[in-house]
Amino acid sequence: TIFALSTNIKSSGSAIAVIRVSGDKTLNVIDEITNGKADGIREKPRQACLNDYVDPKTNELIDKGMTLWFPRPKSYTGEDLCEFHIHGSMAVINKMLSVLGNINDCRLAREGEFTRRALMNGKLHLIQAEGIRDLINARTENQRRRAL
């Protein structure tokens, strides 16, 4: 199971940051980071649920945020996937990433790994994956249009 910050954050932070998790242990990760209190997440896939995020080792509150769960195969990667929408301060982001990295069988994703998994699971074709890369890297209106 992998995780990564999906939002491009400036050094000063931002209002909101999104952290994605994908893989077989995604529901376990949700349970750990919410202390088993992600009420309704299984019954309401693709719907935002407000949760407290805690460090499972200390029970310390990290943040309150929105959790979205996308069960396989109907997710970007084709695997169970969730998004944690948190406040975008560097302190909150770094704490969440640190805590996720300490959860068993959960590791930081390599660059492009979510899209690679989508490609390998038949959710995207190579040309679509290249288009996503080009769109992410687009700096001009012309580059944006060509990527689409």
Give, region by region, the residue ranges found by the protein language model.
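A glycine-rich (often HGG/GG-containing) alpha/beta subdomain
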Residues: T1-R146
